Structures are given as C-alpha cells and as structure tokens.
Amino acid sequence: MNNYGTLTLGAVPIGDPKDASLNLIDYIINHKIILVENVEVFNKLCKDLNIKTDARIIDYGSHDIPDEAGIYIDMLKDGQDILILSDEGTAGIIDPGGRLMQIARQNQIKVKVMTGPNAIIAPVVLARFNRGFYFHGPTPNRDERIEYFKKLQNYELPMVFFVTRAYIEDFIIDANNYFGPDRRVFVCSNLTKQNEFTTFTTLKDISQFVISGDINFSITLVIDGKPPY
C-alpha cells in the first residue's frame, strides 16, 4: 500500500451552474491543486457558485497530455491530491485528464471519478432512441470522417458526434450521403442554458436548418442506427 495522492476527475455543469453537486463544491474548496481546462471558465464557475478556493490553479489547456505530465505524477507520488476539471461535463472523455489518468494508473496512483453532469448522456437520453449507443466525439478531418462513415453505415446503434460550428455544413453533407437523408437524428446545443437548442428530425431536414443559417453554433448529434433494429 503506497501513500500516493489521488487523482480525481471532476464533473462540472454543462450549462446551468445550479447543476453543480455538493461534492464538486466541496472538492473545489478543499483541494490544494486543481488542473483546469481554462482558468477564466473555472473562475466564472466559482463566481456563479459563490465559492472561493485557496488551491493552486494550473491551466491544463489541452485535449492531450502536456509535456508537464511528469510533474503532476510527481506531485501525486508525493502524496498530494489533484482535482482535474474540464470546461463542461466530466473530465477524461475527449477532454483533459484522459491521458493523465492512464499514466497515473500505470504508476499505481489511485484514480477516482466524480458523478455528475455529462455532455454525452444528456443528449442520448433526450434522443429517446432507448437503446445502447456508439460514442465518437469530435469528428476528424473530412477524409478520415468519410472512412468512419463508411464503416458506420450499417451500424444499428445510435451514434453520438460532437461537431464544431466550422465543420457543421460539411459534416451534414457527408452524413446525408452515407447514412441517407431519411435517417433520424437528434440535434442539441447549449443544454441547460437559456439558449438551449434541441430538435428531433431527419438528416435531410437538418440540412435545411444549416442552409438557412438557423444552426450556426457547435452541436451534438445523435444519429439513429440503421433500421430495421
């Protein structure tokens, strides 16, 4: 049994600050080291929650492990606990923390996850497809995306994609070509925020939204699997 510290993957609200758990608030207040994806976003969260922390705040700032990973591992081996937070949702899934978590486990360091808001589960629940799902996350460049779509054409489970504003039009065009215009899709953005957007429709109709300019923000798409199920 070692005396290493614990790496905790935190879960922050995906929109509404009131979704913050008591556990999250307690961890922010009492942790001495907190790795964050963006300091400004973290400071705003603390302001919204009306809390203060004396923790050392480190801007992780990357979706991959930074060169300083060894420093964090040394901190943990020295018995210091570290909390890592993404800007929204649970850290570690297509977010800061995933690679660090792997390295921590390789070094026999305890890793725990905080339950709470999740940017993947909420869209899946709202999509109402009521089955398992395939999570892809951010879409790759166009050539790689087409190869993915070819492999997923006959997949029967719903598929979850994160699409940034800059690539929405190309994504929807490719999705129509490879999944078909009549494939059902749930689209959402800014869940739990005042400007929340949700719609349950088809890929063909989503194309019209994009062409008309009604969708000009980053979105999450849950594309239904190939029928019959």
Q: How would you name each of these model-derived features?
A:
Residues D59-I65, T139-N141:
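Conserved helicase motor
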Residues N2-L7, K77-D81, P158-Y229:
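A contiguous loop/helix-start segment that scaffolds small-molecule binding in enzyme catalytic cores
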Residues I28-I34, Q108-V111, P158-M159:
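Short active-site oxyanion
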Residues R99-Y155:
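Class I SAM-dependent methyltransferase SAM-binding "motif I" and its flanking Rossmann-like core
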Residues N23, D67-Y72, E144-Y148:
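Short acidic active-site motifs
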Residues E68-M114, N118:
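Glycine/small-residue-rich loop that forms an oxyanion/phosphate-binding "nest" at active or ligand-binding sites
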Residues E40-F42, G89-T90, A119, Y167, ...:
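Alpha-helix capping/helix-boundary segments
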Residues M1-G61:
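Glycine-rich, flexible N-terminal cofactor/catalytic loop recognition
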